[in-house]
Amino acid sequence: MSWSIVIAGLIVGLLIGMTGAGGGALMTPILILLFGVTPSSAVSSDIVAAAIMKPFGGAVHYRRGTVHMGLVAWLALGSVPAAFCGVFIDHALGSGEAMQQNIQYAMGAAIILAAAAMVARMLLDSAGRRTASQAGDGPVAEIRVRRLLTVGIGAFGGLLVGITSVGAGSLMIVLLMTVYPQLSMRQLVGTDIVQAMPMVGAAAIGHAMFGGLVFAITASIALGGIPAVLLGAWLSSRGSNFLLRPILAFVLTASALKLLGLGATDLAITMAIVALVGLPVWAFIDGRGRPAAAWDAAGIARRRTLALVSAGTPVGVGFITAALYFGRMRPAIVQAASQDAVPASEPFRAGSPVSTRV
């Protein structure tokens, strides 16, 4: 057992619990880039650890009633066989060094998708897809399951998880958000965690059959991750993680580009551009999606802040303002909106007709 991997598992577990991000996108690159674990062993060990950890989070959501079991069944119908197929593809990509490199490149591409999904999730939230009235646990909304599409989503996620261990978190949640906007975020997260249990279990069995599993790594991840996930979930209900999400998306992008073979200098330049431009753009889009009345109620100048974010980007002022927006302004604006039931700004007005086509 490696205590350094235990500590890494603890940190990753905290981030998973606080943000709802997928563990594979976080832990697997750490094993490869920091601990020198081969990609195939990193994927196998992380998936088996996830299979051990998922039931803890799933049990919490099931007791809270935030799981749509109908969706779980149809997602599992696609994800379980696809996860097995992903494992087979993993070992059909080649042998020796060629296989390891192919798995690493596939993982880098999947993590970029996960980072993009995390950004999309926050932008969908800011666009009014999740209102204050949908934030609570509450009973699961009555929906008609779109069976074929749901099975397809499960198959897509299962295939990615089987190959790379990435995809059970942010990617699946964003896909479900677009298909089932009636479900609250907690219900989406709960449904995703429970459906991931059979999917990850199938992938874990497949990897154990093919070899590559390092029990010491799996045990170290689980030892640090299980209590940390529970602690992170507890902390997330008592504090803001608005700034944590863009930081996490940034780190995921950097690790993905490194896995894809980008050199240190090119990586530093690329990530500097991403930070200096991406964060202000994100803040501007998110800020414009917040109702002006909520800005006023929070005592924050909307027009001036958005002007600094946009016009100040070329000289770095936009980046600083965007960081302040996500860290301090946005939580205050969201709180003001929820307390005063402020209607959302155009084009998503509260009370406006929302399509419920399923």
Regions found by a protein language model. Give the residues of each.
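Hydrophobic, aromatic-rich membrane-embedded alpha-helical segments
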Residues: 160-171, 175, 302-328
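Transmembrane alpha-helix interface/packing and boundary motifs in multi-pass membrane proteins
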Residues: 9-20, 155-165, 312-315
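Membrane-interface alpha-helices
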Residues: 193, 197, 319-347
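Juxtamembrane transmembrane-helix boundary motif
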Residues: 1-8, 12, 33, 62-159, ...
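Amphipathic, cytosolic membrane-interfacial segments at TM-TM junctions
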Residues: 285-309
